[in-house]
Structures are given as C-alpha cells and as structure tokens.
Amino acid sequence: MASTNFRPLHDRVVVKRVESEEKTKGGIIIPDTAKEKPAEGEIIAVGPGTRDDKGALVALDVKVGDRVLFGKWSGTEVKLDGVDLLIMKEADIMGVIG
C-alpha cells in the first residue's frame, strides 16, 4: 500500500490503481499502448465525510485498504511522492470488492 501525507477534504478519496495483467490467459502479451486504464484500485486515504442538512458529519462508506471499482474516466490524476494516484469523490466509486 502506498503511503502519502495528503489528506483529502470532504467526501474525496485517494485511490491507487491496481495494475492489470500484462499477459492474457492464452499467453498473449499485451503491449502498454493497448492496455486500458484499470478501473479498479485501492483506497489509500479518505476525507472526513460530508455534512447533512443539520450540519452533522456523515462519514464515508469506504475506508483505507478497500479495493474498489470506479468509472474509467473517474477522478483527477495526480502524482504524489512519485506515485500516480487518483483523487475522486466517493460518489464516483461503484462498489467495494470483497
């Protein structure tokens, strides 16, 4: 798991993409130019949550270490401490794996 000193605000999360296989089950090697960006990742930081209508803090459903699925174009790509990461809102996450 990547370590970062970045703390997201509100309902944002920091996600590290999980790299896809470089070879198919049939043994065909996939070149970097043909690979799609993986839509699966691991959460490495979460914000405190959002506020409801009464001002109470509502915590996020995801936590650090969760493996999640998200849309192919979700989030903003950033590089922190030399690591490529995504910052996205919790609403961009489709679900938790496992």
Swiss-Prot record:
Signal peptide: none
Subcellular location: Cytoplasm
Main location: cytoplasm
One example of a Gene Ontology biological process annotation: chaperone cofactor-dependent protein refolding
Key words, A-Z: Chaperone, Cytoplasm
Pfam families membership: Cpn10 (PF00166)
Family the UniProt entry places it in: Belongs to the GroES chaperonin family.
NCBIfam families: PRK00364.1-2 (NF001527), PRK00364.1-5 (NF001529), PRK00364.2-2 (NF001531), PRK00364.2-4 (NF001533), PRK00364.2-5 (NF001534)
Protein name: Co-chaperonin GroES
Species this chain originates from: Allorhizobium ampelinum (strain ATCC BAA-846 / DSM 112012 / S4) (Agrobacterium vitis (strain S4))
Protein's gene: groES
